[in-house]
């Protein structure tokens, strides 16, 4: 199937996680690992939602956005919920960047910015810190 890939995709380098030290019980905060177990009741709450996983959820996540907005004291339309930070970055780049509107970012930043820019053919202006 790779013969059908675009040149952009076929030259894409696979993600390589940051330095992986071989130390027992090491918690890699830079990889979003958490040293603590879920709060009490989380497993039961998750188990109670398993049946609904076969259905599409509310794509606007209106109830979740309203709850977050109320907690933060902002309007629900100021909240973006997505399937993780990578999806939200993708949505933001689609909304605000293109060939004529490059992404400006610091030289020391999240390593997925240049990958998304390459995939979406968005110029990236890197600002040294």
Task: Give short role names for the model-derived ranges.
Residues 1-55:
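N-terminal "arm"/small-domain region of PLP-dependent enzymes with the aminotransferase-like
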Residues 6, 39-43, 61-65, 89, ...:
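A general structural signal for well-ordered alpha-helical segments in protein cores
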Residues 25, 78, 123-125:
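Conserved beta-strand segments of alpha/beta enzyme cores
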Residues 29, 56, 82, 127-128:
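Hydrophobic residues at beta-strand termini and immediately following loops
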Residues 32-35, 85-86, 110:
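Short glycine-rich anion-binding loops that position phosphate/pyrophosphate groups of nucleotides
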Residues 61-102:
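Phosphate-binding glycine-rich loop
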Residues 95-129:
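PLP-dependent aminotransferase-like
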């Amino acid at each position: 199937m790779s013969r059908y890939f675009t040149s952009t995709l076929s030259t894409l380098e696979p993600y390589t996680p940051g330095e992986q030290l071989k130390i027992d019980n090491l918690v890699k905060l830079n990889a979003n690992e958490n040293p603590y177990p879920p709060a009490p009741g989380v497993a039961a709450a998750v188990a109670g939602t398993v049946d609904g996983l076969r259905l599409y959820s509310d794509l606007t996540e209106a109830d979740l956005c309203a709850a977050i907005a109320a907690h933060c004291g902002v309007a629900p339309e100021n909240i973006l919920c997505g399937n993780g930070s990578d999806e939200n970055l993708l949505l933001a780049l689609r909304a605000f960047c293109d060939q004529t509107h490059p992404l400006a970012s610091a030289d020391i930043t999240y390593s997925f910015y240049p990958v998304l820019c390459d995939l979406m053919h968005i110029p990236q202006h890197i600002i040294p810190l």
